[in-house]
Each structure stands twice: as C-alpha cells, then as structure tokens.
C-alpha cells in the first residue's frame, strides 16, 4: 500500500514495484490520485497480471488515530484479498460496521473521494463566506461569531467543520489579539477540488 503524492510519483513507484510482484499480487494506492489516472493504472497493472486498488481515504489527523473512512475501487478481483485489511483499519460505526465498502471498478474509489473533497471544499467556502459577512457587515467580534457558529452546530447544521470554526474563532495569539485576524486570506489546494 502506498500513500504518496498523486501523479508521476505514483507511476514511478508502480514501475519500481512491478518487477518484484507476482501474478495476483495487489497494489493499493491510498493517495489522492485523479480517478482518470487510476482507470489507466488499473488497466496497465492488470495487463501485467496483477491487481490494482485505488483507495480514497478520508479522516485527517483524527482518522489516523481512530480509523479513516476508506473508499476502495479498482480491480474487482482484489476486493476479497484486501477487504479484511481495509475494513480492519477503517473507522467503525457504533454497531461495529466498518466505514469501508467496495465502491466499484476502475477509478470508482478515487472518484468518490474526489466528490467527497469537492463537497467538503464547498462547505468550507460557505463557512468562510458566513464568517466574512458576520465580521465585515455584521461588525461582530470573533467571540460573537464563535457563539453563532456554536449555536448553528447544535441544530441541523451540526458538523465537524462548523465546530472547529467556532473553536478557532476564539483562539487568541500571544499578543492577545485574535489569531484569525493574523491569518492571510489565501488558500492552496492539492487538485481534487479543481477536478470536482
């Protein structure tokens, strides 16, 4: 299983791995690969007699500690071989059900991860715009905005992103000012938002 930068590094790693693999072996790509690249890789690896699983993984730091959501897709014959492994590392629902199920063939796993990221980025944009409106036009202080977000988080808008936004609105820097007021209004992205 590899979790490396998407694009050429994945292709390079596959080329390094292939001479050491036997027919029926499985390569799992757990990075944020473009689903179209995964489609191509599935075909290329299967042509060599091996199996390829493009796996979307979500959960960040908390997922690293408690288990991520795992979205595998690729060579269908690989699922019985990797199911126990992937479901074993996945987060679990209260009833023990793993947050991992076979998504489909080809690039399906990475496609679902791309859509997941696109929705998350859209949510983050809405939260950022809400903050901007409350701060600039509502003339509210960050503590007041934090109270509003915390209130929203108790109702139908309850989400991890709104909760952490409420928390960060309250954080002060070493000079006693709001940390948010020192953060530049710029952001980068890894590609999945653009692909969506």
Predicted regions mapped to residue ranges:
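Active-site beta->alpha loop and helix N-cap motifs at the rims of alpha/beta catalytic domains
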Residues: 1-11, 16-19
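A conserved active-site cap/scaffold subdomain adjacent to cofactor or substrate pockets
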Residues: 177-196
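Rossmann-fold dinucleotide-binding core
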Residues: 9-15, 34-146, 154-178
């Amino acid at each position: 299983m590899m979790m490396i930068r998407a694009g050429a590094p994945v292709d390079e790693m596959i080329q390094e791995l292939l001479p050491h693999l036997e027919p029926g072996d499985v390569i799992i790509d757990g990075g944020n690969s473009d689903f179209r690249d995964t489609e191509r890789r599935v075909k290329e690896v299967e042509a060599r007699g091996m199996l390829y699983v493009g796996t979307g993984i979500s959960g960040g730091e908390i997922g690293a500690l408690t288990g991520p959501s795992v979205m595998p897709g690729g060579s269908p014959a690989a699922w019985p071989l990797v199911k126990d492994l992937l479901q074993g590392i996945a987060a679990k629902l209260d009833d023990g059900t793993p947050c991992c199920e076979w998504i489909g063939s080809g690039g399906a796993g990475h496609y679902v991860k791309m859509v997941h990221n696109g929705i998350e980025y859209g949510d983050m944009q809405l939260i950022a715009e809400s903050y901007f409106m409350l701060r600039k036009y509502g003339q509210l202080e960050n503590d007041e905005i934090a109270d509003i977000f915390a209130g929203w988080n108790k109702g139908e808008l309850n989400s991890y992103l709104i909760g952490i936004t409420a928390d960060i609105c309250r954080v002060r820097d070493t000079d006693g000012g709001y940390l948010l007021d020192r953060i530049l209004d710029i952001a980068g992205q890894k590609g999945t938002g653009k692909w969506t």
